Every structure is written in C-alpha cells, then in structure tokens.
Amino acid sequence: MIPGELMPAAGDLTLNEGAEALTLMVANTGDRPVQVGSHYHFAEANPALDFDREAARGLRLDIAAGTAVRFEPGQRREVPLIPIGGARRIFGFNAEIMGDL
C-alpha cells in the first residue's frame, strides 16, 4: 500500500446516493472566474454568481468531495445541489447562518 492510495470496491460507485437533488441555473455576472468547492454552502457563494439563493439555502454541490465547479465570466450553467448532511449546522463561509439551518 502507498500512503494516500485509494482502493475502491469493484464496480460502479454512486456519489451521494439517495440525496434529493435540486438543479439551479447559475450565471457568473462578474469579470473574473469563480470557483465553488464541493462542500461550500452554495447560498453563500460569491455575490457575482446570479441564482436563487433562497432555494439554495442548506445545499451544496452534488459533486465528488474535494472537487469544485468553475464559472467563467458570463457563463451560465445548471448545477445540481444536494442538502448539506450531518448535524446541518453552518459556521463560517460568509457568516450568514452561523448555526442551525
């Protein structure tokens, strides 16, 4: 074994299985690229991103852990979002929640 080596089970792996996804259209209205990580509270993402922030409350991107989605200036795309798991308590980010969802 090599330190950090991953040995996944044989066959297909399904990420976030059973999580109910919501798809939102997101547009980067800024003049610079914006990148959002897999576990970032999406409602608190960069203000240059235009989307329904109320609908995104308590949600994160439905992508593999440790990855991110990049929005180029002027780009519009649909993104799938899933509920933040665990105790559903949010601290940090842009300090808009700071507690229970």
Swiss-Prot record:
Its main location: cytoplasm. Its EC number is 3.5.1.5. Pathway: Nitrogen metabolism; urea degradation; CO(2) and NH(3) from urea (urease route): step 1/1. Gene3D superfamilies: Urease, beta subunit (2.10.150.10). InterPro entries: Urease_beta-like, Urease_betasu_sf, Urease_subunit. One of its GO terms (cellular component) is urease complex. The keyword Cytoplasm applies. It comes from the Bacteria. Pfam families: Urease_beta. GO terms for biological process: urea catabolic process. It is an enzyme of class 3 (hydrolase). GO terms for molecular function: urease activity. Belongs to the urease beta subunit family. Heterotrimer of UreA (gamma), UreB (beta) and UreC (alpha) subunits. Three heterotrimers associate to form the active enzyme. This is Urease subunit beta. The gene is ureB.
